[in-house]
Amino acid sequence: MAVETLSPDWEFDRVDDGSQKIHAEVQLKNYGKFLEEYTSQLRRIEDALDDSIGDVWDFNLDPIALKLLPYEQSSLLELIKTENKVLNKVITVYAALCCEIKKLKYEAETKFYNGLLFYGEGATDASMVEGDCQIQMGRFISFLQELSCFVTRCYEVVMNVVHQLAALYISNKIAPKIIETTGVHFQTMYEHLGELLTVLLTLDEIIDNHITLKDHWTMYKRLLKSVHHNPSKFGIQEEKLKPFEKFLLKLEGQLLDGMIFQACIEQQFDSLNGGVSVSKNSTFAEEFAHSIRSIFANVEAKLGEPSEIDQRDKYVGICGLFVLHFQIFRTIDKKFYKSLLDICKKVPAITLTANIIWFPDNFLIQKIPAAAKLLDRKSLQAIKIHRDTFLQQKAQSLTKDVQSYYVFVSSWMMKMESILSKEQRMDKFAEDLTNRCNVFIQGFLYAYSISTIIKTTMNLYMSMQKPMTKTSVKALCRLVELLKAIEHMFYRRSMVVADSVSHITQHLQHQALHSISVAKKRVISDKKYSEQRLDVLSALVLAENTLNGPSTKQRRLIVSLALSVGTQMKTFKDEELFPLQVVMKKLDLISELRERVQTQCDCCFLYWHRAVFPIYLDDVYENAVDAARLHYMFSALRDCVPAMMHARHLESYEILLDCYDKEIMEILNEHLLDKLCKEIEKDLRLSVHTHLKLDDRNPFKVGMKDLALFFSLNPIRFFNRFIDIRAYVTHYLDKTFYNLTTVALHDWATYSEMRNLATQRYGLVMTEAHLPSQTLEQGLDVLEIMRNIHIFVSRYLYNLNNQIFIERTSNNKHLNTINIRHIANSIRTHGTGIMNTTVNFTYQFLKKKFYIFSQFMYDEHIKSRLIKDIRFFREIKDQNDHKYPFDRAEKFNRGIRKLGVTPEGQSYLDQFRQLISQIGNAMGYVRMIRSGGLHCSSNAIRFVPDLEDIVNFEELVKEEGLAEETLKAARHLDSVLSDHTRNSAEGTEYFKMLVDVFAPEFRRPKNIHLRNFYIIVPPLTLNFVEHSISCKEKLNKKNKIGAAFTDDGFAMGVAYILKLLDQYREFDSLHWFQSVREKYLKEIRAVAKQQNVQSASQDEKLLQTMNLTQKRLDVYLQEFELLYFSLSSARIFFRADKTAAEENQEKKEKEEETKTSNGDLSDSTVSADPVVK
C-alpha cells in the first residue's frame, strides 16, 4: 500500500532528470573540495613534524615499497560469466592456459635462467681446490631435477594449447563445431604459445653457451665412474648408484644436449586413441599460419622503430611458432620464411636474457634445413656480413646516440616534472590524463630503446669476441646512467605516478567501454538471430563486464580473448577497431607501468660485463664535473643482487654476493677512492709547501681537476650499506696525518695546517689528532735527545743566561734551537717520569766522560807539567801578589802542541776543552730538564685557584654519598692535584744528586792525580778564549763551518768539576782572572801611550796596526770577562760559597735537628697516653 500511495508523488522525477544531475555534481564538487582541504591540512601537519617528508622519494632510501599492480581476487570461473555456456568454456580454457604460460615464464625468468647463468660464479680459479667442481655440481643436481620437471610441464602445456586450438578449428565438415570460428582469430593464444617456446629456446641457448656447466658435468660423471668401481670405499650402496646414473643420463639427454626446444616440437601431437587430429587438420594449419602472419605483420611494422615495445621478444616467439608449424604440418611458406630472415638485416641479434644473445638466421637455418636449401648461399652469407657491419656502424654512432638520448631523456624528465607538478584542472581533466599517459609511455619507450642498444651492443661484442674501444665503453656506460635516470625519475615521483596511473586506467577503461557499447548497440539493433551473432554479443558483454573493475592481468587477458570473438562479423567499423586496439595496448602498458619500467631498466646483464667498470671509474675520476652519476652506476650494479639469490651451486648464495661485493669494492678503491685520497693528500702537501717551489702548479699549464665535487655527493648505496666518499677520504687523511705525526711529532704544525686546508678547500671535517703538540719552532724531542745524548752534547752549544741550546752546524737553512718550552711540551707528551730517566742517562754518559777525563789527567806529560806549575806558583806567589802569571798559562797552551796535534789541527788541550764543554752541556741539559719540568707543572696547575688550600674532592664526594665510580674519579683527581702541587713546589735537586754521586769518588786518595785540575784551568781558559774568538770571527765572515757565538758548556763543565774536586778555594787562590785583567789593561795602556807618541809623527800604517792591536786586546779582555761572568754564574748552581767540609758540617747539623724533633714528638706521645686512658 505504501508503494501505491507514494508512487504518484514521485512521478515528476521522470521529468526532473537534469536538476538531479546538477545536484549530484555539486555534491561531488563539495566532496572534492573537502578532500583537497583535508590533504593540504595533512601536508601542513607533515611539514610541521618533519621537513624531509615530501612527494619526492629518495631512490637510496626506500623503507616503504609502493606496488601499483592490482591483484585479482576472483577466479577465472567467476570472471567469465555469460549466458553463453559454450563460449564461457572456450574462453575459460584459453585464459587458464595463458595464465599457466605466464606463470611458467615468470618461474623460468627468475629461478631457472639465473640458476643456470650464475652456475660456477663466485669462485675464482685461484680459490678453487681440487674437487670443488664436483661438489658444486653435486649441489646443483637437485636444481637440474627441478628444471627437468619444469621442462616436462612446459611440454604438456604446449601439447594442451595445440590440442585446444585444433579442437576449435576442425576441418571435418561432419563433426559439430564447438563455436563458429569463421573470422575468429585467437591471436593472444599464439602469442602466449610463442612466449613459452621462447622460454625453452632460451634454456637451450643458456646451456649451450655455458662451458663451465658442461665441464663440471663431465668431471662429475667421471667421479661417479670411479665411485662405481669401489662403492664401499665411499660408503654408497651399489643398488642406489644404478638408478642415479640412469637419472643423470636422463637429465643429460633432456637438458644438456641442447634438445629442450627440439624435443618439445617433436612431440606426438596427434592423439593416438582417436582424439584430436592435429597434423591432418588443414583448417587448423591455415589458422595457425594466418595467426603467425598477423602477429608478424604487427611486429615487422614496429621493429627497430622508436615506438617499439616488446616486438623483439614477439619475433623470437614467431620464429619458434614457425618452426613448430613446420614440424607439425610439414609445409613451408618460402616467401614468409624469407621475410623472417629479412628481419635479420634490421635486427641482427636479439638478447634473450642477461648475456645470452640469439641469432635468428642461425636458428631458422638449423631448425628448418629443408627451407634453408631453397635459399641461395649468398643471401645467407650476406646476413652474417651485415652483422659485422652493424656492429661497426653501432660503434661509430654510439657517441651520437648518447648525445641524442641525453637530450631526449633530459627533456622528458622536465616534462615529467612539469606535468606532475602542475595542478589538475577539473575542466581539462581528461586532456591532462591523456598527456600524463603519453609522457609515462614515452619514458618507457626511451628506456626500451636505450636498454636494447646497450644489451645488443655489449653482448654482440662479447659473442663475436671483438675488442671494445674506450670511447664505446664510456658511451655505453653513459647510456646505462640514462637508463637508471629514467627509473629514478619514475621512482622519485612514485606518489604522483601512483595517483595518476589509477586515474589513467579508469579513463582508458572508460574509452574502451564506450567503443564496445557502440558495437554492442549495433549488434542488438540487428534483429536477425544466429548462433554466431549470439557469440559476438556474449563476447562483447563479457568484455564489458570484465572491464568494469580493476585492470588486472587476468581481466585484460579475458577482454583480449573476448574481443577475438567479438570483433568478427564486422561488429566494429575499421575506424573504431584501431583506436580500441590502441586503447587496449595503452591499458596494458599503464597497468603494468612500474613492472615494465623496472624490467627494461634492470641492468643485471652488467654482471657479465663488469670488466668495463674500471674504465668507467677512471673516466669519472678524470671528469669529476658530473661525479653524481656514480649513483646511477651503483644502482645498476645493484640490480644483479636479486638474480644472484637464485644461485644454487654454492653452500649459500651469500658467498656469491660477498664475492661480488668484494670485487666491486676492490675496483672502486683502486680506480677511484685510493687515487682520490692520494691526489687530495698530494694537493694538500704541495699547497702547504708552496714556499719550496717543488713543481709548476699553474692551472693554465698543468690543468686542474675540481675534486671537491666528489665530496658534495650523497653517500652511494651499495648492497646493505652506504659508500661515503667524503668519510672515506677524511678517514684516510686522518689516519695518515695521525700516523705521520706520531712518527715525527715536530711536524704536528704542518699536518694541522693541512687539516685546516682540507676543511677550507674540500669541506672535509677532520678529527683533531689530540697528540701532544710541540712549540711552533720545531725542536728535538726529550726522548730523542736522551737516547742520543753523546751526539747531542757534541752537536749543540749551551747558552747559560737564555737557557737555550743552539745547533753547532746544519745543512739546513735554519739552525735548530731547544728551549724550556720544547722541553716542557716533551715532558707533557711523555709524562714527568721522563725527567728521572733523562738524569739516569746523563749519569751514564758522565761516567764514560769522567773516565777519559781521568786518563788525560793521569798522562805522564800532563801530570808532570801540572806538578811543575803548582810548584812554580807556590814559589813565586809571594813575589807575584798571589796571582798566577799569564805567561805561564800561555806557555802551557803553546807547549802542549809539541805533544802532537790531530789531522784537524787540534792539540790535546783543545780536545780536553771539548771534553769539559760536553760535560758542561750535559749539566746544562739537566738544568733545562728541571726548568722544563717546573714549567710543565706550573702550566698544568695554573687553573687551581689556591695551591695552599686545595679542596679534598674524595671527602666531598663521601659526604654527598655519591656513586662508587664518582668516588674513584674524585680520588684520581686528588692524586693528580697533589702530584702537580708537589712537582711545582719542589722540583728535584738534580745538580746536588749528580755532585753527591761523583764527588766521593773524585776526592778519594787513589784519584789524587785529579787534584791537579785547578792548575790546568788557566791554560784551558786561554785556549777557550782563543777558540771562542776564532768562532765569532768566522760568524762575521759568514763562514758557517765552525762558526758560533756561545759555548757556556765550558764554564758549566769547569764549575762542576771544581765542585766535584772541592777546589774552588784552590782555584780562587790563583787569582787568575785578576792576573788576566791586569795583563791586558797594562798592554792596552802601553798601546794607547804609543799611539799618542806616533800620532805626532803621522805614520799612518803604524797607527792602523796599533788600532788593530788595541781592538784585539779589547776583544780578548771582553771574552775573558764574559767567561769570568759565566763561570761565576755556573758556580752558583753548585754552591761555590761552601767547601765540602762546610757542607758536611751543615748536613750533620740538619740530621741532629731532625733526630731531636722526632725525640720530642715521641715524649709528648708517651706523656699523653695516661690522659687518654
UniProtKB/Swiss-Prot annotation:
Task: Please state where this protein is localized.
Answer: Early endosome
One matching Pfam family is WASH-4_N
Q: Which residues carry this modification: Phosphoserine?
A: 7
What job does the chain carry out?
A: Acts as a component of the WASH core complex that functions as a nucleation-promoting factor (NPF) at the surface of endosomes, where it recruits and activates the Arp2/3 complex to induce actin polymerization, playing a key role in the fission of tubules that serve as transport intermediates during endosome sorting.
Q: Which family does it belong to?
A: Belongs to the SWIP family.
Q: Name one GO cellular component term.
A: early endosome membrane
| Species assigned in the record | Homo sapiens (Human)
Q: Which InterPro entries match?
A: WASH-4_N (IPR028191), WASH-7_C (IPR028283), WASH-7_central (IPR028282), WASH7 (IPR027307)
Q: Which domain of life is it from?
A: Eukaryota
Q: Which disease is it linked to?
A: Intellectual developmental disorder, autosomal recessive 43: A disorder characterized by significantly below average general intellectual functioning associated with impairments in adaptive behavior and manifested during the developmental period.
Q: How does it assemble?
A: Component of the WASH core complex also described as WASH regulatory complex (SHRC) composed of WASH (WASHC1, WASH2P or WASH3P), WASHC2 (WASHC2A or WASHC2C), WASHC3, WASHC4 and WASHC5. The WASH core complex associates via WASHC2 with the F-actin-capping protein dimer (formed by CAPZA1, CAPZA2 or CAPZA3 and CAPZB) in a transient or substoichiometric manner which was initially described as WASH complex.
Modified positions (N-acetylalanine) in chain numbering: 2
Coiled-coil intervals in this record?
1135-1161
Region named Disordered: 1142-1173
> Which residues carry the post-translational modification Phosphothreonine, per the record?
1154
Protein's recorded name: WASH complex subunit 4
Q: Which residues lie in Polar residues bias regions?
A: 1157-1167
Q: Which gene encodes it?
A: WASHC4
Stretches for region Sufficient for interaction with WASHC5: 705-1173
Provide the GO biological process annotations: cognition; endolysosomal toll-like receptor signaling pathway; endosomal transport; endosome organization; neuromuscular process; nuclear envelope budding; protein transport; regulation of Arp2/3 complex-mediated actin nucleation
| Biased composition, class Basic and acidic residues, residue ranges | 1142-1155
Keywords assigned: Acetylation, Coiled coil, Disease variant, Endosome, Intellectual disability, Phosphoprotein, Protein transport, Transport
